[in-house]
Regions:
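Feature captures the catalytic ectodomains and active-site-proximal regions of enzymes
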Residues: 1-285
Length: 285
């Protein structure tokens, strides 16, 4: 089993490198391979772009160094860690769903609503997500210090409660519909007077879920995305150091365990399980 390496080789440590590149104070380990030499930092996060898939796609070689994700490694937890500089146990967004004692419900963190209801961001009427979790945000900290940040993300998550703590409500935001306009905005941001540029790309994760992580559609997507990002980034390497990374990878699943079919197990729960399929939390009697 592979554990997160929080001492210098994890997504958490990349968050510390971002903080350092913006001239903000941090007391926690950074990624040593990213020198603090005055270059600005550009981070491109490809959702679901795992190390093994990268090797099979031909964009990584066997033996290349890698960093780990965080635990839990689901997108919500990983992205918030990356953009807050907080460990999962500090920001407390521990999966796709979380039991929030203050509200007395299990909430869907992607849609910020109770899991058994409909209505995206409906809990905003009770308390904003940013206030519920009290997450720090590196973009907000940097902007207060006079830094300029560009955040490029898909249109379908624009103005959602989740993006207030993953992308921040500060900085300059650019929404895109497909990879091609994402790369356009990315190039424009690198050409602009920004101190930090962040691009989030979800496509590989979607294809991994539909076709499998090592399917040709997903491997071709990884190849195309990585090569396209590199073509843009190389023209700006004198000013920006570009890091292409991921929130997590994927593995091919074997047998699924349906815990709901075990009546004895169900009877021990005080509330339904929450978290995610890769990291389930139980509250038992």
């Amino acid at each position: 089993m592979l554990y997160p390496d929080y001492e210098g080789r994890s997504l958490y440590n990349l968050s510390q490198s971002i903080i350092t590149s913006l001239g903000l104070p941090t007391r926690r380990p950074v990624i040593k391979e990213i020198p603090d030499d005055g270059k600005k930092l550009s981070v491109v996060l490809i959702d679901g772009f795992g190390y093994r898939a990268g090797i099979k796609a031909g964009v990584l070689a066997e033996g290349d160094p890698f960093i780990t994700s965080v635990f839990p490694s689901i997108t919500t937890t990983a992205l918030i860690t990356l953009m807050s500089g907080q460990m999962p146990g500090e920001h407390c967004v521990l999966g796709g769903t979380t039991f929030v004692k203050k509200l007395g419900v299990i909430i869907d963190n992607f849609s910020y609503m109770p899991v058994y209801t409909k209505g995206r961001d409906s809990l905003k009427e009770i308390t904003p997500m940013k206030e519920l979790y009290q997450v720090e945000n590196t973009i907000e900290r940097a902007e207060r210090e006079g830094k300029k940040c560009a955040i490029i993300s898909p249109d379908f998550i624009k103005n959602s409660e989740l993006t207030t703590i993953t992308n921040s409500s500060s900085g300059n935001h650019f929404s895109y519909y497909h990879l091609w306009d994402a790369l356009y905005y990315y190039r424009k941001a690198l050409e602009g007077d920004y101190d930090f540029v962040y691009l989030y790309i979800p496509f590989a994760d979607k294809l991994s879920h539909f076709y499998g992580p090592y399917s040709e559609p997903n491997l071709e997507a990884i190849r195309s995305i990585v090569e396209a990002v590199k073509r843009v980034a190389v023209d700006h390497r004198s000013r920006f150091r570009t890091v292409i990374t991921a929130d997590h990878g994927h593995v091919e699943a074997g047998e699924a365990i349906q815990m709901g079919e075990n009546a004895n197990l169900r009877s021990t729960f005080t509330i339904p399980p929450f978290g995610s399929t890769r990291s389930i939390f139980f509250s038992g009697k």
